[in-house]
């Protein structure tokens, strides 16, 4: 049977493409690494075994203390929280002064209560907490403590054990690591209180892990940075940042496969490069970077399969992109369940491709018979052979690729935490974890000031406020907020609505051709597969960052609609350049609220252009 010559060479990467995407990735990475986090953090500390262990800090003179900093570590107890009660010497006795509650670790906590005294008595007590079940914790690891008089770090003092089973001097042995003020650069913020700690627990093979509401793979990947650079902010953020940078080559490949054009591949990558959420979310030590990366990968290979006829490639070669798509699906699901939503879209695209290809194969077969290149008697036999190989057998392989292999990857992702002393085998551990995670997410209903509903995300009606810098100079601020670049998200949502109309009415097919129209369904289906499940998801407390994996598909739809408008001469290439320039300008203007850069408070307020934008 005659076939068309090969796959469109325009979809292949050439030297020019490699240079472009390499430069873009390196430029982005250089920007993303600026002030990512400190390579140093306190490593030793005081870990009292009993309640009410205490020590005295003697300054040898009367000093005015107006700030006390405290950095907490993981210690050896799961409930590594507690409270330090601090009493001040008034000349006759120690009187109550202040408390520092350690409810989170690997960050600098502080009190600004002031006192004039020559000595302090510090005692560990049960954690002061609103919930009764939290008040039992006291086995904290206090890694470093510091005293300030004004902006000056007080260094001249002696420490005496009063009632302590551990070496208290370890609480004051890394004073050079004390920052002038606490900030994200020196410690955890937002959900980093969960994931880096859990990654360390997995590395140390702890019997109980802290964050158990998502599969382990994301924490395993995060832990690679900790293994290489240590338990410090740079160490726990670097892997997510690298995956964020690697999303750019994936975006370029998606654009290249989709449009067969270097400019549009560059255009798509550029928009992702300067999208706000991509920058913010991948610099945060959570697991969303890995999830979005794997979702992009699974759709890249499904696009590769969907965009070419399997019978032209040959049976064995046609299975390769399906295998790779399934592997990425498994990796995504082993990181965060939301990646599994993409399976709905993958199934739609796969079965649509089988129907479309059968129609195309039959059309070509009939043409070959009409040209007497095939015998009419062979028609039924050839069609049955096609269906057996390219539908039945391919579907059977898809059971392996999209069910068995992902399930295996998911199960194997639990190996790093299999050494826990709970008596369960690996499969039992996975099943118990799945039940626990489902019940947890179904039961998350407590209100949150920055939660938002699924229908608010495309218009960014309620961004997520991640970080507010404490102890800032008068009139200055430091903030990190999670939102999208307005020109990417708002234009993208308009492109999504336009794409539905253009595809359903066949306008893209008439202007850009049937192949581009066919591929145009990929970002639309991908977007809907990741977005619509949130309408019916059992989890009711949701946030705008749940929309992150949808962003690459919005960008592809922007490019598709602009290509169509160019095709009908409604706009020229200049419009794309103007959009790209405007996206960059907005990224620069909003950079302080994306990076935590200290800026005048009035400027940060000016950036709040919608009523519920708050930082």
Give residue ranges: language-model regions.
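Short helix- or helix-capping micro-motifs
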Residues: 268-273, 300, 329, 333
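Aromatic-rich transmembrane-lumenal/periplasmic boundary elements in polytopic membrane proteins
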Residues: 152-200, 387, 406-456, 460, ...
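Transmembrane helical bundles and short interhelical boundary loops of multi-pass, membrane-embedded
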Residues: 2-20, 30-57, 75, 90, ...
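Membrane-interface transmembrane helices that cradle and orient dolichyl/undecaprenyl
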Residues: 298-321, 332, 351-360
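Transmembrane-helix signature of polytopic, membrane-embedded enzymes
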Residues: 251-274, 293, 312-320
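Short acidic/glycine- and proline-prone juxtamembrane loop motifs at membrane-interface regions
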Residues: 236, 240, 277-291, 338
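Aromatic, loop-rich ligand-recognition surfaces of beta-strand-rich domains
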Residues: 33-187
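Transmembrane-helix motifs of polytopic, lipid-linked glycan transferases
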Residues: 234, 238-259, 297-301, 501, ...
């Amino acid at each position: 049977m005659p076939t068309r010559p090969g796959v469109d060479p325009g979809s292949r990467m050439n030297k020019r493409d490699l240079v472009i995407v390499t430069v873009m990735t390196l430029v982005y990475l250089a920007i993303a690494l600026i002030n990512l986090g400190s390579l140093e953090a306190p490593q030793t500390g005081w870990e009292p075994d009993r309640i009410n262990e205490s020590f005295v800090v003697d300054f040898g003179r009367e000093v005015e203390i107006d700030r006390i900093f405290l950095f907490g570590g993981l210690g050896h107890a799961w409930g590594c929280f507690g409270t330090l009660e601090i009493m001040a010497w008034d000349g006759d006795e120690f009187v109550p002064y202040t408390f520092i509650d350690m409810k989170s670790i690997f960050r600098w906590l502080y009190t600004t209560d002031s006192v004039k005294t020559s000595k302090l008595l510090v005692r560990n007590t049960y954690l002061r907490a609103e919930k009764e079940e939290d008040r039992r914790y006291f086995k904290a690891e206090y890694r470093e403590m510091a005293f300030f008089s004004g902006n000056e770090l007080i260094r001249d003092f002696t420490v005496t054990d009063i009632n302590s089973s551990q070496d208290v001097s370890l609480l004051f042995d890394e004073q050079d690591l004390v920052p002038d003020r606490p900030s994200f650069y020196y410690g955890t913020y937002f959900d980093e209180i969960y994931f880096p700690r859990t990654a360390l627990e997995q590395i140390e093979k702890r019997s109980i892990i802290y964050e158990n509401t998502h599969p382990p793979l994301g924490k395993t990947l995060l832990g690679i940075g900790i293994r290489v650079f240590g338990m410090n902010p740079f160490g726990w953020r670097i892997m997510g940042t690298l995956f964020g940078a690697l999303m750019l080559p994936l975006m370029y490949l998606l654009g290249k496969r989709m449009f067969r054009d270097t400019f549009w591949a560059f255009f798509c990558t550029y928009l992702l490069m300067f999208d706000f959420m991509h920058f913010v979310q991948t610099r945060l030590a959570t697991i969303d970077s890995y999830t979005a990366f794997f979702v992009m990968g699974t759709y890249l290979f499904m696009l590769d399969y969907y965009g070419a006829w399997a019978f032209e490639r040959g049976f064995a070669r046609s299975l390769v992109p399906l295998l790779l798509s399934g592997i990425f699906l498994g990796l995504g699901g082993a990181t965060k369940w939301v990646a599994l939503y993409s399976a709905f879209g993958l199934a739609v695209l796969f079965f649509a491709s089988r129907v479309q290809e059968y129609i195309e194969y039959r059309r070509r077969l009939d043409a070959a018979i009409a040209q007497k290149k095939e015998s009419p008697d062979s028609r039924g036999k050839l069609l049955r052979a096609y269906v057996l190989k390219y539908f039945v057998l391919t579907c059977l392989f898809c059971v392996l690729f999209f069910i068995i292999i992902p399930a295996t990857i998911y199960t194997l992702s639990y190996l790093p935490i299999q050494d826990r002393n709970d008596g369960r085998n690996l499969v039992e551990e996975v099943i118990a974890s799945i039940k626990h995670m489902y019940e947890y997410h179904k039961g998350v209903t407590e209100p949150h000031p920055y939660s938002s509903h699924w229908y608010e995300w495309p218009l960014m009606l309620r961004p997520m406020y991640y970080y507010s810098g404490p102890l800032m100079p008068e009139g200055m601020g430091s903030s990190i907020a999670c939102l999208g670049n307005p020109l990417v998200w708002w234009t993208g949502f308009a492109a999504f609505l336009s794409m539905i109309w253009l595809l359903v009415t066949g306008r893209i097919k008439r202007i850009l051709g049937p192949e581009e129209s066919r591929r145009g369904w990929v970002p639309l289906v991908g977007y809907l597969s990741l977005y619509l499940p949130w309408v019916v998801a059992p989890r009711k407390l949701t946030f705008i960052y749940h929309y992150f994996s949808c962003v690459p598909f919005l960008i592809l739809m922007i490019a598709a609609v602009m290509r169509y408008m160019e095709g009908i001469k409604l706009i020229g290439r200049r419009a794309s350049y103007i959009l790209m320039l405007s996206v960059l300008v907005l990224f620069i203007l909003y950079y302080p609220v994306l990076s935590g850069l200290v800026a005048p408070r009035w400027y940060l307020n000016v950036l709040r252009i919608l009523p519920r934008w708050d930082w």
